[in-house]
Amino acid sequence: VSLYESALFRYNSAVEAADDCCHSRLLLISPARIQGRKRYTMSNPIVTIEMENGDIMKAELYPEIAPNTVNNFISLIQKGYYDGLIFHRVINGFMIQGGCPDGTGMGGPGYDIKGEFSQNGFKNDLKHTEGVLSMARAMHPDSAGSQFFIMHKTSPHLDGAYAAFGKITEGMDVVNKIAETATDYSDRPLAPQVMKKVTVETFGVEYPEPEKC
């Protein structure tokens, strides 16, 4: 999700939003394919995000939709990458974004992956409905790394432009709570929204390391 898109939620027109965002950096957003897997099966990976306050969110990942994106997310989780990171950008009625190691929205894992979405030539029909997980990127389509966002509300203008790869199955109330927290002028929560521990259950399936750009 870019700053330009989020600005549309705060300004009277796209022109106003673009004028404001031209002075800002875009945030990071991205991607892989396992054949023969039925969509939405119990064998799909399940991610558990435990917040610092004890709240729990669970999400199902869809490797048959965005295989390299899922491989990347699982790889980072298994390395403990997300433990202690925050949701640094929160927009009520839109989405919550996290996964930046610096907590600024400008950091990443030190590499990029290919964007698995239709505008980048990759078939991905998963819509950005409430609870869907998707990868953040910069302007370049192949610039996703570790930052991801969870949809607070359905946002069809993102469909085909970002690599959606999973969906919240438990704890949407936690997403709502984070989305409704007070933020500053840059959409940063005033009270840090910390992911204490992020784990993944792969049900015995070994997922490969992601292909990097």
Pin down the residues of each PLM region.
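Aromatic (phenylalanine/tyrosine) cluster motif
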Residues: 4, 9-11, 40
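Cysteine-centered motifs
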Residues: 21-22
